[in-house]
């Protein structure tokens, strides 16, 4: 596939848009990064995640239904940390402090994925080639989900609004146990090469993969 190329913009739309956004925050006395509400939410999510893990693993209920409900809650907390902590941290908007953003972003590594790969596929590729089929990895859920009109249509897609939650949960496992490694060894996301990984990036990739396997598979 030919990778799309964009001409340098000749209009001032982007400049004006960024200026108006900046003016909005300044005029209303708001920060463009997280505040106490976000930090409190992050603490609640992380502590709930840790507490539920301990109860599930070391104080397992005798009632199967209770364990099943806890597993569902555990999955929701995983998604909650991903969307509310990791996402903002990896975008550099969780805090004004760089180390806190990096710490929030690293929560993804603890959940089994890798923040370096995520930044490559989301911050760089998704936000450059947004919703372009064959390039934007964030809309590649074929053949289970059709997220773009250019993707091949299967009869099952007429029901995807009913099964998409289940499909997304399975895609998460596919992500952490397959596609992360695929990107790592191929050195690219789809047709786009990723930045060269430093030694610390390799160490973080394998270290957290082993840690995740030990905590969530072996234990």
Regions picked out by a protein language model, each given a short descriptive name:
Residues 18, 22-39:
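Membrane-interface, cytosolic juxtamembrane amphipathic helix immediately N-terminal to a transmembrane helix
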Residues 2-11, 29-32, 112-115:
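Short intracellular "coupling" helices and adjacent cytoplasmic loop segments at the cytosolic face
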Residues 11-24, 118, 122-130:
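Juxtamembrane membrane-interface segments of multi-pass membrane proteins
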Residues 4-12, 60, 153, 198-202:
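Generic amphipathic alpha-helical segments used as scaffolds and interaction surfaces in large
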Residues 32-82, 109-110, 161-173, 196-219:
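Alpha-helical bilayer-embedded segments of polytopic membrane proteins, i.e.
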Residues 73-197:
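Membrane-embedded catalytic scaffold of the fatty acid hydroxylase/desaturase
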Residues 1-23, 170-186:
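Short, charged cytosolic
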């Amino acid at each position: 596939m030919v990778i799309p190329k964009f001409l340098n913009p000749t209009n001032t739309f982007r400049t004006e848009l960024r200026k108006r956004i900046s003016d909005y925050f300044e005029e209303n006395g708001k920060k463009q990064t997280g505040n106490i509400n976000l930090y409190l939410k992050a603490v609640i999510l992380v502590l709930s995640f840790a507490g539920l893990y301990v109860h599930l693993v070391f104080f397992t209920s005798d009632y199967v239904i209770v364990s099943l409900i806890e597993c569902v809650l555990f999955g929701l907390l995983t998604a909650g940390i991903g969307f509310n902590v990791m996402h903002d941290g990896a975008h550099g908007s969780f805090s004004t402090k760089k180390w806190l953003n990096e710490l929030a972003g690293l929560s993804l590594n603890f959940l089994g994925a890798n923040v370096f790969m995520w930044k490559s596929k989301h911050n760089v590729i998704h936000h450059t080639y947004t919703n372009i089929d064959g390039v934007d990895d964030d809309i590649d859920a074929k053949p289970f989900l059709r997220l773009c009109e250019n993707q091949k249509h299967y009869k099952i897609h007429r029901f995807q609004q009913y099964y998409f939650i289940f499909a997304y949960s399975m895609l998460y496992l596919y992500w952490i146990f397959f596609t992360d490694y695929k990107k790592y060894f191929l050195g690219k996301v789809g047709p786009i090469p990723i930045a060269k990984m430093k030694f610390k990036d390799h160490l973080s990739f394998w270290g957290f993969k082993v840690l995740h396997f030990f905590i969530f598979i072996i234990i």
